């Protein structure tokens, strides 16, 4: 038996994080019965001579939460998990917490577009026992001591709503301090003052000057303490980074004149300063290029995989100018960037000496290809691509006999990695890169399968919660929300639309399903209640009809069923989609309140029931689907048609019995009886047949469609849908050479041409939501029901002769659970590994239920 992956709030040995609650989690490897209890203890002493808190798991999940009110500032804590004669120990350390800041915000007089350096020299005559640096900048920053960069993270402090919170970082600098020490910062524009937002963007969104605040706390071996603060004595200078922008890239000129600026103490509040929630952005992988010349005779680096990150190289000769431009694709054999819109995505180096190691600092790129000027081919082959993402464990592995399916799963994972950088972005390359909520609503379940997302999503939910507080509970289309005056853009002037807004319920719900973290759920439960309450208040103001047939809706975004080429609007009735999500969000909220034994759950349970009943009353006549309901002439539909006219000059057809409409009704049980269900299934079969088994769904329907097909008995239709290779399909993208998932089903046409440039990313994760179907239905790993006291994992694979074998391994809340199956004549050989302290049962093809023991379980099944 082995204990591993000890984490506090989803982070291993967190230093200086915000601890509004404490959740201790771990994994077990080995055969241990679920009835064995695990004990967790917390102490200030490494010997655990005094126990500050202890608790025992009351479930079969390896996780336990408690309040954090016993924590003290700037204190290292030891914690251990133990049972029988086995234990494992880890640590966590608090930040300044609520201690007042003695440091001052510092900046400079005048104006500059350049990057800025802040520095201060210190002398230490005594031996240092322990030292911590607490700091943050307005703008992205890197910090060095004696010219050595601190830590492995980049793009600090990440992206958050600067007007609502400002997260500071804590560094252990004990080993860095010598007798004469210089602490230096380089601060760029970043999201704080650099160009950001679509349609050309805005500058100086949060401020027009970089700023810094820093405190160095030193404890010496003689027991004395000293603290050093940012103030007017710090030196402020320009540096070699002449230009930097999230969208446009970075320019470094080593001949640029370094100017000393006048240091200025700025009267800025420290009330928004809070310990970090954001995970560090780190290099997770390095890739090496194939060098070739395109049809325009331009030198191109092909890294074979689309990534988010930058390049790194060491110059072999003096260079007057080297230019790198980053793009996603080739067109007609040539480098192509038109789909980036206004984003330049360039890295330029000027007047560099031989031996200089170069990389960007305050930007990142979405790319597979790099156009290079100023290097020889021998020099270009030494360029390394470094993939950046927020630091998270990957938690799912997949393999099968179908290489195309394997590539699809890889593409989904890469799109998640590429877009999980500080916040969950829509895309990493064009002039957008924003935290769109709708993408995450449909993808959050898959995201939690692929990675340990608790801390990452906690940071995003904090931003979402703060933005929601400004909107009376409505959820914005993206978070953070840049506060700019742009009445032309409807996404900035509106909030509270179905699917997008439902990120407020889907993210907390899916986090709890996967990780059973009650502390995290308590912290962000208000996201759920505030969002549903907001919908409820709008509903009540219109008479309490329990239909969401009002307001501004996007419907089934990017669906193909309108028949209008290039349109972003699908044909499914927006009121049907919105009302279904009204029901789902109320239901999820009720369930999470029940988990926390909160008696408010009954209100939301009743609300969900009322919404469901109204949906059935509106969209069914007896057991027949009503294809001409009153909602087709509703406020929401009129607004949607107006949007279609304003943003495309088209009229959108509207229907109920689309693939999306039918899939949503079926998957979420929104029908009056089994006869009605059977008729929905028949109609869905007809809709699939109309399109030769291909999908026509958009954001709202794609995740539900394969589940609805299989759960309705259309098993082969569901699996055939997954494995189709022509457009529109998931594997068509693979056939076209994709290494990430696309924003549109037709981002690239069968002839290899890009379908358009206005809104066409090759690195969007939303349609990767199909992965949860692969895990839950094809492999057959189904998480315990959130309200099921038996806490039982259900293993129920769906075999198909189109695949010889399939294997999936999931790092659950308890440890690795793997399922593999292989066809063997008329039999299927099934191999299942269950982690310790885990209850699981297998459901065979003929319906037999078999409880599984921790460890290996082998059995035979049959295929139908």
What are these regions (language model features)?
Residues 512, 583, 589-590, 608:
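Heptad-repeat amphipathic alpha-helical coiled-coil interaction surface used
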Residues 152-157, 161-163, 332-342, 454-564, ...:
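Helix-terminus loop motifs that line ligand-binding clefts
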Residues 183, 252-253, 431-432, 447-450, ...:
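C-terminal capping/lid segments that line or modulate ligand- or cofactor-binding pockets
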Residues 134, 310-316, 321-326, 362, ...:
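Alpha-helical support elements that line or immediately flank enzyme active sites
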Residues 1-76, 80-430, 438, 455-458, ...:
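Extracellular/oxidizing-compartment recognition motifs
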Residues 202-206, 213-215, 224-256, 265-267, ...:
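Non-catalytic C-terminal accessory modules of carbohydrate-active enzymes
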């Amino acid at each position: 038996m082995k204990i591993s992956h000890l984490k506090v709030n989803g982070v291993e040995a967190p230093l200086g994080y915000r601890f509004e609650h404490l959740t201790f989690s771990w994994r077990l490897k080995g055969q241990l019965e679920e009835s064995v209890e695990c004990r967790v203890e917390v102490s200030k002493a490494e010997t655990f001579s005094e126990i500050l808190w202890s608790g025992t798991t009351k479930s079969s999940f390896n996780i336990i939460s408690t309040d954090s009110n016993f924590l003290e500032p700037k204190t290292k804590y030891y914690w251990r998990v133990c049972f029988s004669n086995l234990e494992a120990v880890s640590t966590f350390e608090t930040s300044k917490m609520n201690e007042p800041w003695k440091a001052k915000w510092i900046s400079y007089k005048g104006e500059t577009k350049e990057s800025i350096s802040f520095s201060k020299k210190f002398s230490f005559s005594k031996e240092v026992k322990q030292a911590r640096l607490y700091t943050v900048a307005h703008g992205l920053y890197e910090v060095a001591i004696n010219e050595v960069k601190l830590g492995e993270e980049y793009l600090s402090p990440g992206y958050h709503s600067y007007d609502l919170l400002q997260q500071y970082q804590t560094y252990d600098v004990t080993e860095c301090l010598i007798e004469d020490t210089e602490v230096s910062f380089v601060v760029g524009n970043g999201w704080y003052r650099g160009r950001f937002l679509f349609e050309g963007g805005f500058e100086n969104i949060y401020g027009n000057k970089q700023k810094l605040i820093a405190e160095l706390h030193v404890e010496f071996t003689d027991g004395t303490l000293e603290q050093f603060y940012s103030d007017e004595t710090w030196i402020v200078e320009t540096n070699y980074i002449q230009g930097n922008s999230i969208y446009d890239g970075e320019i470094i000129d080593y001949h640029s004149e370094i100017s000393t600026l006048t240091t200025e103490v700025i009267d800025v509040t420290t009330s928004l300063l809070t310990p970090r929630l954001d995970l560090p952005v780190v290099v997770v992988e390095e890739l090496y290029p194939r060098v070739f010349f395109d049809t325009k005779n331009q030198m191109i680096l092909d890294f074979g995989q689309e990534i988010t990150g930058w390049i790194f190289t060491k110059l072999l000769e003096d260079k007057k100018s080297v230019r790198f431009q980053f793009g996603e694709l080739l067109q007609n054999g040539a480098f192509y960037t038109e789909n980036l819109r206004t984003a330049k995505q360039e890295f330029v180096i000027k007047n560099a000496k031989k031996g200089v190691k170069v990389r960007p600092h305050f930007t990142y790129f979405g790319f597979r290809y790099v156009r290079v000027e100023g290097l020889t081919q021998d020099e270009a082959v030494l360029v390394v691509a470094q993939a950046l993402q927020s630091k998270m464990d990957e938690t799912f592995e997949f393999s099968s006999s179908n290489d195309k399916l394997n590539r699809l799963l890889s593409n989904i994972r890469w799109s998640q990695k590429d877009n999980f950088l500080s916040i969950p972005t829509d895309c990493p390359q064009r002039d957008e890169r924003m935290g769109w909520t709708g993408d995450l609503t449909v993808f959050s379940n898959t995201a939690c399968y692929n990675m340990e997302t608790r801390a990452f999503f906690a940071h995003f939910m904090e931003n979402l919660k703060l933005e929601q507080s400004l909107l009376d509970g409505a959820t914005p289309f993206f978070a953070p929300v840049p506060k700019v005056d742009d009445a032309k853009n409807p996404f900035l002037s509106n909030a509270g639309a179905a699917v997008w807004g439902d990120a407020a319920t889907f993210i907390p719900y899916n986090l709890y399903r996967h990780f059973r973290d009650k502390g995290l759920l308590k912290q962000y439960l208000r996201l759920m209640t505030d969002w549903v309450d907001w919908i409820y208040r709008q509903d009540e103001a219109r008479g309490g009809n329990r239909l969401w047939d009002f307001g501004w809706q996007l419907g089934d975004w990017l669906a193909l069923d309108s028949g209008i080429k290039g349109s972003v609007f699908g044909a499914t009735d927006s009121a049907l989609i919105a009302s279904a999500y009204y029901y789902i969000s109320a239901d999820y909220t009720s369930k999470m309140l029940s988990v926390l034994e909160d008696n408010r759950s009954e209100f939301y349970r009743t609300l969900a029931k009322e919404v469901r009943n109204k949906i059935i009353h509106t969209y069914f006549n007896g057991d027949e689907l009503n294809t001409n309901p009153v909602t087709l002439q509703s406020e929401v539909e009129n607004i949607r048609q107006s949007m279609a006219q304003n943003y495309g000059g088209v009229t959108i057809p509207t229907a109920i019995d689309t693939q999306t409409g039918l899939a949503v009704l079926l998957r979420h049980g929104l029908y009056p009886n089994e006869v009605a269900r059977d008729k929905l299934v028949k109609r869905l079969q007809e809709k699939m047949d109309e399109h030769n088994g291909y999908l026509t769904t958009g954001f709202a329907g794609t995740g539900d469609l394969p589940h609805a097909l299989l759960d309705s008995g259309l098993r082969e239709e569901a699996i055939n849908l997954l494995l189709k290779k022509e457009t529109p399909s998931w594997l068509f993208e693979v056939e076209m050479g994709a290494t990430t998932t696309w924003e549109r089903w037709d981002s690239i046409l069968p002839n290899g041409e890009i379908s358009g440039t206005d809104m066409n990313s090759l690195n969007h994760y939303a349609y990767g939501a199909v992965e949860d179907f692969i895990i839950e239905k094809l492999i057959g790993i189904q998480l315990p029901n959130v309200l099921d006291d038996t806490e039982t994992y259900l293993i129920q694979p769906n075999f198909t002769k189109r695949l010889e074998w399939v294997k999936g391994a999931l790092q659950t809340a308890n440890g690795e659970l793997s399922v593999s199956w292989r066809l063997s004549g008329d039999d299927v050989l099934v191999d299942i590994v269950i982690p310790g302290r885990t209850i699981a049962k297998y459901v065979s093809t003929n319906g037999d239920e078999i409880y599984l023991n921790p460890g290996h379980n082998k059995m035979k099944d049959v295929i139908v």
